[in-house]
Amino acid sequence: MRLELHQLSARHPAARPAAAPAIRDLALQIGAGEQVAVIGPSGAGKTTLLQVLACALPPSAGTFTVDAQSPWQLPRRALQRLRGRLFLAPQVPPLPPRQRVVTAVLAGRLPAMGLWQSLRSLFYPADIPAAFDALDRFDLADKLFERVDRLSGGERQRVGLARALLSPASLWLIDEPLSALDPTRSRQAIGTLVDTARERGATLVATLHQVDVALAHFPRIIGLRDGQLAFDLPSAEVTRARLAALYDQFEHELRGEVPVTAPGESSGQQPVVMHCR
């Protein structure tokens, strides 16, 4: 999918009328098959940008097109079909607590299924080997038949990412996928996503707080601050000076000072859920 934003601004639906837009005057082009990381301090507008790209939040000014089409000018059914071509992984995966992991992972295929097939898959998983392989890429194969509510926060986050590997989507939008993972798990998870997206020719846009991981795995880096574009560069051209300016007064985020309480997991803080529909 090719994404284009022209002087785009967007405001959160719950924001006060006088509040500044969460993102403003953004001009970006993301080509089909690109892998792009979006970085910046807290409150920079990263999640809002993903909401716009997910066709979940209409722009308040400017234009947004997907493959040269404006999503918000499409008929409702056509908009639903377009949303079915993208995969959105929010910070907190919306996994039913009593569901088996195998069912949760195979839910990544639901957009390509009919109603009857979707309902049947809730009780009779259709492709257990595929679910096993996807989980194995994230070192979770042993959790295949575990219940979701028995997983740790980091394991649930990786189950949410494993869904992407089974999704038929050509656009993957991943919001802070590493918030519950330690550095080793983080690098493994991002490496798996980037490599798989590249193999399939899928467009991947991920928001990240872990700048070192973004620079190591993504060929293109977009920096946001205060809702505006700070830079859009190949990763090799993102200098320390640019990062220092981007994270001015937020140096602790640039240093990655996130408390980790156990191998593979974070302190358990729960980020805000982002819904796409």
Predicted regions: what they are:
Residues 62-70:
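Conserved ABC transporter NBD signature motif
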Residues 54:
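Helix-to-loop junction immediately C-terminal to a conserved catalytic motif
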Residues 147-151, 155:
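Conserved ABC ATPase signature
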